[in-house]
C-alpha cells in the first residue's frame, strides 16, 4: 500500500481481516481491544496482536469476513474461475465483494485484488468436502 500511495495518493487501499482479529477495531478506533479476539481459522490474515510491520496510515478501509464465507469463496474461485488459490485469497475476494456492497463505485473505478497464495496447502482443508462439513461450512 505504501508504495502505491506514494505514487498516487488517490489510490484506496482496502485491508481484509478475519472476524475475530483485532485489526479492524484498532484501525477504526486506535484501541487494542482484547474482547475483539475470537477464534478464527482463515490462515494468513488477521491477528491477535498489532505487529510493527503493519502501517495503518496507508490503509483506507478494512473489511472483515468470516471463515465460512472465505472458505466458500476460495472453492468458488477454483470451480468457477479455474484459480487454485489459498484461503486468504478467498478472503480477499469475499472482502472485495463486501466492500463493493458497502461502498458505491463508479464506472471509472478500477479494483485490483492481490491473491497472495496457492491452494496447495489447503487440499486437506478448504478443498476437502469432509473437512468443510466438519466445520459446518457445507450445509
Question: Which residues does each predicted region cover?
Answer:
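Surface-exposed amphipathic alpha-helices with a cationic face
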Residues: 1-8, 100
Amino acid at each position: 500500500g505504501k508504495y502505491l500511495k506514494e505514487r498516487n495518493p488517490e489510490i484506496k487501499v482496502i485491508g481484509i481481516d478475519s472476524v475475530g482479529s483485532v485489526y479492524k477495531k484498532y484501525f477504526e478506533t486506535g484501541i487494542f481491544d482484547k474482547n475483539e479476539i475470537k477464534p478464527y481459522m482463515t490462515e494468513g490474515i488477521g491477528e491477535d496482536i498489532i505487529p510493527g510491520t503493519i502501517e495503518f496510515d496507508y490503509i483506507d478501509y478494512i473489511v472483515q469476513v468470516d471463515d465460512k464465507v472465505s472458505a466458500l469463496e476460495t472453492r468458488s474461485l477454483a470451480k468457477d474461475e479455474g484459480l487454485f488459490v489459498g484461503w486468504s485469497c478467498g478472503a480477499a475476494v469475499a472482502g472485495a465483494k463486501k466492500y463493493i456492497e458497502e461502498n458505491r463505485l463508479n464506472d471509472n473505478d478500477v479494483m485490483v485484488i492481490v491473491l497472495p497464495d496457492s491452494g496447495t496447502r489447503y487440499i486437506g482443508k478448504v478443498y476437502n468436502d469432509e473437512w468443510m462439513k466438519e466445520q459446518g461450512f457445507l450445509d
